[in-house]
Amino acid sequence: MAGQTTADYIGHHLSFLKTGDGFWNVHLDTLFFSLVAGATFLFFFSRVAKNATDGVPGKFQCFVEMIVEWVDGLVKDNFHGSREVVAPLALTVFCWVFVMNAIDLIPVDYPPQFAALLGIDYLRAVPTADISATLGMAICVFCLIIFYTIKSKGFSGFVKEYTLHPFNHWAFIPVNFVLEIVTLLAKPISLAFRLFGNMYAGELIFILIAVMYMADNFLLQALGLPLHLAWAIFHILVITLQAFIFMMLTIVYLSIAYNKADH
């Protein structure tokens, strides 16, 4: 943008539309685009469900059915309890994260430029490039881990799991508790930071490539387009892979919580 230094340009594109100060500020753009992504997924899948026929299905219906069967198969192979909750959860996680990730393919200048027309100073369009969004989803998974652990073993079994393992003696309860709590907390933290780190890096690379268009050197400007295209093609793989990893780890963590043997 005219009149901006490279640092200003990058800083502007990495700034959130937020309300409040400090720890309790809310990123309004993250909330908006995550809701839009969820609504988009629900709209298309609900339309397919309403228009589903027993005859020859359309191409999009085949595509949706293929995704549903694929996710259900993954849950069946990895989670050995009832799939009534976990299968829809896994499908929602994969599709929702995928759509949020896919927003990163929109040229980086378009969202802030559109926001400027509405009098909005800052706007970031990729919810999964915001640690608050990925951490929020990971905390939900964490709560489900606790729920399925208690459901499968009872509250007493849950307490034993975190106090009498790996050393089955009352004297080691403090040590066992620290070790198990660290292991437990590492799951949502790694889940959140893996998705956030990959999507933040992807967004930053798009921004750095866009900076090349602002360069005075014609060669750098000319290199911007092929680099942008190459990274966008590669990023499609990253987008899909990160959605798959988040879904699979969710399934695996819930499976471990549900099936872990009593100690």
UniProtKB/Swiss-Prot annotation:
Complex formation: F-type ATPases have 2 components, CF(1) - the catalytic core - and CF(0) - the membrane proton channel. CF(1) has five subunits: alpha(3), beta(3), gamma(1), delta(1), epsilon(1). CF(0) has three main subunits: a(1), b(2) and c(9-12). The alpha and beta chains form an alternating ring which encloses part of the gamma chain. CF(1) is attached to CF(0) by a central stalk formed by the gamma and epsilon chains, while a peripheral stalk is formed by the delta and b chains.
Compartments in which it is found: Cell inner membrane
Role according to the record: Key component of the proton channel; it plays a direct role in the translocation of protons across the membrane.
The protein's name in its UniProt record: ATP synthase subunit a
Keywords attached to this entry: ATP synthesis, Cell inner membrane, Cell membrane, CF(0), Hydrogen ion transport, Ion transport, Membrane, Transmembrane, Transmembrane helix, Transport
Recorded topology in the membrane: Multi-pass membrane protein
Any one cellular-component term (Gene Ontology): plasma membrane
Pfam families on file: ATP-synt_A
TM spans (from-to): 26-46, 86-106, 130-150, 166-186, 195-215, 229-249
Annotated source species: Glaesserella parasuis serovar 5 (strain SH0165) (Haemophilus parasuis)
Cross-referenced NCBIfam families: ATP_synt_6_or_A, PRK05815.1-1
A GO term, aspect molecular function: proton-transporting ATP synthase activity, rotational mechanism
Taxonomy, superkingdom: Bacteria
One of the protein's GO biological processes: proton motive force-driven plasma membrane ATP synthesis
Keyword Acyltransferase: no
Family: Belongs to the ATPase A chain family.
